[in-house]
Amino acid sequence: MLNRYPLWKYLMVFFAIITAALYALPNIYGEDPAIQVTGARGASVDMSTLDAVTTALDKEQLSHKSIALENGSILVRFNDTDTQISARDVISEALGKDTIVALNLAPSTPDWLEAIGASPLKLGLDLRGGVHFLMEVDMDAAMEKLVGQQEEAFRSELREAKIRYRAIRPSGKEAVEVLLRNEEQLAEAKAMLEKNHPDMLFVESDSNGRYALTATFTEQRLQEIRNYAVEQNITILRNRVNELGVAEPLVQRQGASRIVVELPGVQDTARAKEILGATATLEFREVDDKADLSAAANGRAPAGSEIKMDRDGRPVVLKKRVILGGQSITDASSSVDEYGRPQVNISLDSEGGNKMSAFSKKNIGKLMATVFAEYKDSGRRTPEGKVILDKHEEVINQATIQSALGRNFRITGIDSAAEAHNLALLLRAGALIAPISIVEERTIGPSMGQQNIDMGIQACIWGMVAVMLFTLLYYRGFGLIANIALMANLVLIIGVMSMIPGATMTLPGIAGIVLTVGMAVDANVLIFERIREELRDGRSPQQAIHQGYANAFSTIADANITTLITAIILFAVGTGAVKGFAVTLSIGILTSMFTAIIGTRCIVNLIYGGKRVDKLSI
């Protein structure tokens, strides 16, 4: 019999729409301003932490809707954002540096919906408000640092092998040149270094009594270095974001050397920019106490040493070899010494502790300097438009090694408590592998985000109203069926997106929904026009319905599959905003095919199937 579906098809459509509606429902309930408290660096929060938070809020008379310990973190809900911001400062002061206190928005989803895993869609930066940074990793500086490390490695290895050399110096941006005394030493050095460094290419040259060995990295190794610089910087930026206390941040790679950082809900954008863009780190160097100070004042330093200035502008001669860098620091905190001066307490990892212990044992009575290094925007750009960074280094502390140092010690010579606090924060989060510059900054206020939501919803509503009026007036009864399918399609899109872990609704995503609303009716228009053609050809209403759906299917499938391929390509090659549009469009294409072909057919079959029909309302 024509136009009859088996029972399972009706049940499939019914349960699909009901399931989507349940998962879309949490988006109606909205969100509460909240604070999330989690442990820092592996620490955990427990009931004692919960009591401390409650006590701190009660002491300052800050009211809250609820407070609970859930999944290893404390969630405090508030009635308004003003109380939320005040409470963040109070809780941070009460708990100290062992916790991360983050502003958040907690969904007001009922427990029965949470029990089935239903949660509202996450809103992107353009809808929620916040700050967007596009950062570029300075690969030239990364290579300069690596070449310097290779110079030191070559010096140590040649000394250990007792091969005498004239000089070791950089050659260009990505190579090291070793000058030897004779041909025999050149051959020995090449054999030894090739064995120790299989990822480098060594080319020897012998002209006019100049014996040189030029070492360059293989192309594969260069690519690994570049990838490592970007990936490590991403990890460190994530640590810094955690220190800032931002919930649900986005830190991801874009292209070969760029990183996107999005911080939803951040109000203090200047502070975020200061911490994320900072390139400060520490180096511990041995002071060359045998150097001629008068020569140093004129800018001359002995071989193996270099001149750095202290904060008073006086020259200090330091050995080029770095005892320890910021990468060995596992923890740092700011405090004051017995004289009330700011200081930073440093803890090293086991390898760094062993290096510091071994060095200090051999150099008791000698001076060790703490060098503060930072890259700053020079205001200049390359012909390609890249920001040129200048490296600023200064000696902030010189101390005599009184005894063997271990994994924990302190540094002084810092100007202010605020500087000590910032330096400790950066050292805790980790030193950047290569300096970064902010090439794009965009701030979206919460009111602008809400305006985007309101305008997006209005566009969706008016788009649906216009389409529904047209189909209702032009196709009458069948137009009403198409309108029911259109509303079901919208529920399916929101429901499916709410089910996808990590899916984010953005303004381009809303544009994708509005576009899908128009596209969803296309399939119904094709079907209804085919039914009209079949009726004009003299077929009965039942045959016209059957042939209309059957003949229109291939056209609908072809059109939607080609659009789906385009959406997949957009997702594969696009950035954040384009990806959001592509995801929504892809889901919309699939759901519109489902509702237009199967959904409307179910309704049509229920109304007309198995009955004698003389006329169709189309």
Swiss-Prot record:
Question: Which parts pass through the membrane?
Answer: 10-30, 455-475, 477-497, 508-528, 563-583, 587-607
Q: Any one cellular component term from GO for this entry?
A: plasma membrane
Give the UniProt keywords, A-Z. Answer: Cell membrane, Membrane, Protein transport, Translocation, Transmembrane, Transmembrane helix, Transport
Task: Extract one GO BP annotation from the record.
Answer: protein targeting
Gene Ontology molecular functions: protein-transporting ATPase activity
Q: Kindly indicate whether the keyword RNA-binding belongs to this entry.
A: no
Q: Does the keyword Cell membrane apply?
A: yes
Compartments, record wording: Cell membrane
Which Pfam families does UniProt cross-reference here? Sec_GG, SecD-TM1, SecD_1st, SecD_SecF_C, SecDF_P1_head
Q: Tell me how this protein sits in the membrane.
A: Multi-pass membrane protein
The organism's place on the tree of life at top rank = Bacteria
InterPro entries documented for this protein: Acrflvin-R, SecD, SecD-TM, SecD/SecF_arch_bac, SecD/SecF_CS, SecD_1st, SecD_SecF_C, SecD_SecF_C_bact
Impact noted for substituting R240M: Nearly abolishes protein translocation
How would you summarize the oligomeric state and partners of this protein? Forms a complex with SecF. Part of the essential Sec protein translocation apparatus which comprises SecA, SecYEG and auxiliary proteins SecDF-YajC and YidC.
Q: What does this protein do?
A: Part of the Sec protein translocase complex. Interacts with the SecYEG preprotein conducting channel. SecDF uses the proton motive force (PMF) to complete protein translocation after the ATP-dependent function of SecA. Expression of V.alginolyticus SecDF in an E.coli secDF mutant restores protein export in a Na(+)-dependent manner, strongly suggesting SecDF functions via cation-coupled protein translocation.
Family, according to the entry, reads as follows: Belongs to the SecD/SecF family. SecD subfamily.
Name of the protein: Protein translocase subunit SecD
What species is this protein from?
Answer: Vibrio alginolyticus
